[in-house]
Amino acid sequence: MGAAMAMFRKRLMREPSAYPNQRITFLDQYMLRELAKDYKHFSGGRKCFKFRDFFAEHFIGTAPIESATHKKWYIDVDHLYACLFINGDHWVALDIDLPMKRINIYDSIPHLTTKPEMARQCMFLREMIPAMMSAMVPEEIRKKSNARLEVKRIKKKVPLNKDPGDCAIYTIKYIECLALGTSFDGLCVENMKAIRIKLAAELYDEVRETARPYELDMCREEIRIPQLEDSP
């Protein structure tokens, strides 16, 4: 998943960019995991909590170095796209809409997670992202507010994973389509084999040399990319 998000960031940096809306970014998977880890300390004492420089680098778009966008959240970015791993066995796509103060969730198997549980799984983002903006965005640009982000599950015209096992692919394709401003037409079980092969080829071609090892491991484990080597 990390490799896919790195690929999308690299595409965002191209001139011309394929993305019609340039006020977007794709969150790094390692940063999300670190944010979730720090949530315990954050929720235990917000007044004493200070975000690490690591998070500031991601906030201003200078990290990850190999796919830095140099876009600052809220100032240059309205939408943060993210892949969230929930319940230890399922991926969902997030469109974190900063101006609307809302996390839009795209879930290929929605019956697996109740609405309250999904809200709980997103809690570290709902609380820490507003706090990051309050700490890192000048008050003349954004009035300080630590109010939780709302959560909304998007269901209309969202294709479902009727053959469970491809939630990671659906998640990546949701994010790609949202960023491109296109519909989800063609994202279905009948096309899944072709989608897998195309995605594997794109990842191999665009990020194999710059993606960090854990990103490739995540991708290999969750997406099960087919081998591309020539047969003996």
Q: What positions do the PLM features span?
A:
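Enzymes acting in ubiquitin/UBL processing and closely related pathways
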Residues: M1-P232
